[in-house]
């Protein structure tokens, strides 16, 4: 069997099993992963015969995808903000919608850096793969270096293996971010200019937990008590103690949670509370300033 024949069969199998997914892209990515060849090489030399060892590997990979396992877990990596990130089954898979949080955090950070502060500190709570912290570091480190403003970015996660994974991503992308093990603020000292988080926010009874990629993702990174609001509320209530004056907290949340999250911010005396919409025009990120 050659590349062309395997692709045709794999595309047909995937389309039959998961008609809403892009079967051609999935099949090609799996073939690239198994052979170590680029997309261009595979398509240009599609009559290349597949040896038995690679064919067995492809069969195993395709079987996992046919069962619905996300491509990111099969490959062990996912790109976010143009950064290649290692992923594991202990972390959420970084999603494009989370780039909305990064974009807004960058906008606020750049405005604050215009004031030439003596230093700039950012905290990422529940960092997972480190995606948010590393994306911010990739953009802000060159700017802070040019302006001679010391930049410190810290990412925390509850699980030690997840912290190690995030650290591996910092090393892979040669970015200076410190990753610590902590349950939210428990092991955090000092104050920050920005606090960002994509915490668990799904209700345990949500039917979407049994659909698509989330079936394979860790429930601890997805589900929160109090109909999904427990961790959001906890962070909003405590974050003010860890922010400098005029510091900002930015939180990602579910597309139907914006109104409730804004009210929790306001109940806790945050100012200039606003919600940012994602690429699908859903309320996705809510932020507030701490003026006290």
Swiss-Prot record:
Residue stretches spanning the membrane: none
Reaction equations catalysed: L-glutaminyl-[peptide chain release factor] + S-adenosyl-L-methionine = N(5)-methyl-L-glutaminyl-[peptide chain release factor] + S-adenosyl-L-homocysteine + H(+)
Chain positions recorded as substrate binding sites: 198-201
UniProt xrefs under InterPro entries: DNA_methylase_N6_adenine_CS, HemK-like, Methyltranfer_dom, N5-glutamine_MTase, PrmC_N, RF_methyltr_PrmC, SAM-dependent_MTases_sf
Gene3D superfamilies associated with the record: DNA helicase RuvA subunit, C-terminal domain, Vaccinia Virus protein VP39
Class in the EC hierarchy, top level: transferase
Keyword Cell division among UniProt keywords: no
UniProt keyword annotations, A-Z: Methyltransferase, S-adenosyl-L-methionine, Transferase
UniProt keyword Methyltransferase present: yes
UniProt record, GO biological process: methylation; translational termination
EC identifiers of the protein: 2.1.1.297
A Pfam family matched in the record: Methyltransf_31
GO molecular function, one term: protein-(glutamine-N5) methyltransferase activity
Similarity field: Belongs to the protein N5-glutamine methyltransferase family. PrmC subfamily.
Function: Methylates the class 1 translation termination release factors RF1/PrfA and RF2/PrfB on the glutamine residue of the universally conserved GGQ motif.
Protein name, UniProt field: Release factor glutamine methyltransferase
Source species of the chain: Haemophilus influenzae (strain ATCC 51907 / DSM 11121 / KW20 / Rd)
Lineage: Bacteria, Pseudomonadati, Pseudomonadota, Gammaproteobacteria, Pasteurellales
């Amino acid at each position: 069997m050659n590349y062309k024949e395997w692709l045709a069969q794999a595309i047909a199998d995937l389309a039959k099993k998961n008609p809403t997914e892009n079967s051609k892209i999935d099949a090609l990515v799996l073939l690239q992963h198994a052979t170590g060849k680029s997309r261009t090489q595979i398509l240009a030399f599609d009559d290349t015969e597949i040896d038995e060892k690679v064919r067995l590997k492809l069969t195993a990979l395709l079987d996992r995808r046919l069962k619905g396992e996300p491509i990111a877990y099969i490959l062990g990596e996912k790109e976010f903000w143009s950064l290649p990130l290692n992923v594991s089954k202990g972390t959420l898979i970084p999603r494009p919608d989370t780039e909305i949080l990064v974009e807004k955090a960058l906008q606020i950070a750049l405005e604050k850096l215009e004031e030439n502060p003596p230093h700039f500190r950012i905290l990422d709570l529940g960092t997972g793969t480190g995606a948010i912290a590393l994306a911010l570091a990739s953009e802000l480190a060159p700017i802070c270096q040019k302006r001679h403003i010391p930049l410190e970015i810290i990412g925390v996660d509850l699980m030690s293996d997840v912290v190690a994974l995030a650290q591996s991503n910092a090393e892979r992308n040669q970015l200076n971010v410190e990753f610590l093990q902590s349950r939210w603020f428990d092991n955090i000292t000092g104050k920050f200019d920005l606090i960002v988080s994509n915490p668990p926010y799904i209700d345990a009874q949500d039917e979407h937990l049994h659909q698509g990629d989330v079936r394979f993702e860790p429930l601890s990174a997805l589900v929160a008590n109090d109909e999904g609001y427990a961790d959001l509320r906890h962070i909003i209530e405590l974050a003010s103690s860890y922010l400098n004056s005029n510091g900002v907290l930015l939180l990602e949340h579910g597309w139907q949670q914006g109104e409730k999250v804004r009210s929790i911010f306001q109940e806790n005396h945050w100012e200039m509370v606003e919600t940012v919409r994602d690429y699908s025009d859903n309320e996705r990120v809510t932020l507030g300033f701490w003026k006290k």
